[in-house]
Amino acid sequence: PFRTGEEGTPALPLVHDMETKFFEQLLIDCDREFQELIKKLQISQSAIPTILDYYESHDADSLTKKIKSIKSFCGIYAPLTKVENGYIPDYTSRYFTEDIPYGLILIKSYAVKYNVSTPKIDSIILWAQENMGKKYLIDGELNGENIDETIAKYIIE
């Protein structure tokens, strides 16, 4: 249900239970893009290791297993809202209202500034902005009508 948010999920899932190979592979792909940016910024990989290194994993399956084994992630509910046919993502939760404009947009801003390609990160921004009713990224450029609500204006000039 988190992929589209249109169909309700019947129960309120824990974030821990939503960890799947699909999401972990997307996380790995985004991390690869982020690591390319880290190289351009000349930051040591030892300062910011890859997600696979950090979680002592080697692929999406092992990362999924590792994250599901972390006790501190248990008991955290996904940011969802109750609707008639179950639950849908709550696009007003801080997972969206903070993590997109001050997280992914921050990374994307530096990627633009340092000419690093971010197709997977872009796909998440596009998905989120559509569901949040915001416009940050238009045709690969951070020039949407809501971009001034983000940190991008301080990075890209």
Predicted regions and their residues:
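NAD(P)-dependent Rossmann-like dehydrogenase/reductase catalytic/cofactor-binding core
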Residues: 2-17, 21-157
